[in-house]
A protein has these predicted regions:
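Short polar/charged helix/loop
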Residues: 18-19, 72
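Anionic-ligand binding patches
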Residues: 38-184
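Cofactor-binding loop segments of dinucleotide-utilizing enzymes, especially the Rossmann-like FAD-
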Residues: 7-8, 28, 110
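Single conserved hydrophobic/aromatic residue that forms the stacking wall/gate
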Residues: 1-9, 13
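Glycine-centered loop/turn motif at secondary-structure junctions
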Residues: 19-20, 184
Length: 184
């Protein structure tokens, strides 16, 4: 169950209270392969919505947040790499280039469901073959969209960010808290 925040409180109080609200992490059984979309941003919003509603159905009365992130390289979606070669392929494509990171967030209380997508443009410095090989030999790229963790070693490759850093990490915190306040 979810601990609520008094609706009589000011928005500032609500937002501060959300940092201390108890929550439980639930893994969704949503089948991501069923989702089709015209754009990477639409895809990630539908994935977040599917995950959110799958968990919401199992936890009636709870406020559920679902989220997903994809890396968009000229319209090609980079999810989590499936192999070392896949990780290297993604990193070569990101090297010295700009790409978009889209994070979809969906919140539902079982009655009402709202969602949004936040996007951020990221530019990497050129990466050497040795850097790519070394990074692909670590565990870091394999559970991350686009084969990199911006808060990890990939921070060294960062030339420019246009947008919310937390969108790249997978949860645009301030926008999520603003939307979550509507459910409290």
């Amino acid at each position: 169950s979810t601990q609520g925040v008094s609706s009589a409180a000011s928005d500032v109080y609500k937002r501060q209270s959300l940092y201390t609200t108890d929550f439980t992490v639930c893994v969704s059984d949503f089948d991501e392969s069923t989702v089709q979309a015209d754009t990477p941003a639409q895809l990630v919003e539908q994935l977040a919505r599917g995950k959110c509603l799958a968990v919401s159905a199992q936890h009636p009365g709870a406020v559920v947040i679902g989220c997903d992130t994809v890396v968009d390289v000229n319209g090609e979606v980079f999810g989590k790499p499936h192999s070392t070669e896949d990780a290297k392929r993604m990193l070569r494509a990101l090297s010295g280039a700009a790409h978009e990171v889209h994070t979809g967030v969906c919140i539902s209380d079982g009655t009402r469901t709202e969602s949004f997508v936040d996007s951020c443009r990221v530019t990497f410095f050129p990466l050497s073959g040795e850097e790519i090989d070394f990074y692909a030999s670590t565990a870091e790229p394999y559970d991350k969209a686009g084969a990199y963790a911006i808060q990890g070693r990939a921070a060294l490759w960062l030339d420019r960010i246009e947008g919310d850093y937390y969108t790249i990490m997978g949860l645009p915190v301030s926008r999520t808290v603003q939307l979550l306040a509507h459910f409290m």
